[in-house]
């Protein structure tokens, strides 16, 4: 009887080993992500460009590496910010920067001027979330996509004329790898690909057991 159960027990042990190995891979990846998040001071230190509003600087599918430990963002710097009230992080360039106090630029920090005029806009959206740190001073920013006609005022939350460095920014772009994040775009635009990948993973597990 024990001899007849032995193959089944062996299969169970093999399955448990594969599950534990998979869990170990996931937990290791999660710990590496959290460590990178702490090091960069950004809750989303790596993001993928999902639209063409920053062309030619960045293309869809480019993988961006962020840094969020600088107290200021300078004019010309490319940043990722979060739209308040929406889970829509956007990759755009700083075109105006206002002082280090919390006053409205219209009242005490200078009048805000738009860098361009027009109506048509595209958003360079990236996967990620906003992260703030109380050590940052208040710093107001106006952003714009390089491939857009107008600045981002219409993209901001209602009643918001500029970004707050402390509240809205996910981080500043410090490096990138072209195109490697395009698989993220494919999975978001074609949900059926997720099912195909899961099916392939299941087949691989079965083949490994054999």
UniProtKB/Swiss-Prot annotation:
Keywords: Endoplasmic reticulum, Glycoprotein, Hydrolase, Membrane, Protease, Signal-anchor, Transmembrane, Transmembrane helix. One of its GO terms (biological process) is protein targeting to ER. The active site is at 53 (charge relay system), 92 (charge relay system), 152 (charge relay system). The keyword Protease applies. It catalyses: Cleavage of hydrophobic, N-terminal signal or leader sequences from secreted and periplasmic proteins. InterPro entries: LexA/Signal_pep-like_sf, Pept_S26A_signal_pept_1_Ser-AS, Peptidase_S26, Peptidase_S26B. Glycans are attached at residue 41. Residues 101-110 have a biased composition (Basic and acidic residues). Signal peptide: none annotated. Residues 32-210 are lumenal. Residues 1-14 are cytoplasmic. It is found in: Endoplasmic reticulum membrane. It is a single-pass type II membrane protein. Residues 101-124 are annotated as: Disordered. PROSITE patterns: SPASE_I_1. Catalytic component of the signal peptidase complex (SPC) which catalyzes the cleavage of N-terminal signal sequences from nascent proteins as they are translocated into the lumen of the endoplasmic reticulum. Specifically cleaves N-terminal signal peptides that contain a hydrophobic alpha-helix (h-region) shorter than 18-20 amino acids. Belongs to the peptidase S26B family. The C-terminal short (CTS) helix is essential for catalytic activity. It may be accommodated as a transmembrane helix in the thinned membrane environment of the complex, similarly to the signal peptide in the complex substrates. This is Signal peptidase complex catalytic subunit SEC11. The lineage of its organism: Eukaryota, Fungi, Dikarya, Ascomycota, Pezizomycotina. The gene is SEC11.
């Amino acid at each position: 009887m024990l001899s007849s159960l032995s193959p089944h027990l062996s299969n169970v042990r093999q399955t448990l080993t594969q599950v534990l190995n998979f869990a170990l891979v996931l937990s290791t990846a999660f710990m590496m992500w959290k460590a990178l998040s702490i090091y960069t001071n950004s809750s989303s230190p790596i993001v993928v460009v999902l639209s063409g509003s920053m062309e030619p600087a960045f293309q869809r599918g480019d993988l961006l590496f962020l840094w969020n430990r600088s107290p200021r963002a300078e004019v010309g710097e490319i940043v990722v910010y979060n739209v308040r009230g929406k889970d829509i992080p956007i990759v755009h360039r700083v075109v105006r920067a206002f002082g280090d106090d919390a006053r409205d630029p219209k009242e005490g920090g200078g009048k805000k001027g738009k860098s361009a005029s027009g109506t048509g806009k595209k958003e360079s959206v990236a996967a990620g979330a906003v992260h703030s740190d109380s050590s940052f001073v208040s710093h107001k920013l106006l952003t714009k996509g390089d491939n857009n006609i107008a600045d981002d005022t219409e993209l901001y939350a209602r009643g918001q004329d500029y970004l707050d460095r402390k509240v809205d920014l996910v981080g500043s772009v410090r490096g990138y790898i072209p195109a490697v994040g395009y698989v993220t775009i494919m999975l978001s635009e074609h949900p059926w690909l997720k099912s195909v990948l899961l099916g392939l993973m299941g087949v691989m597990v079965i083949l490994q057991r054999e």
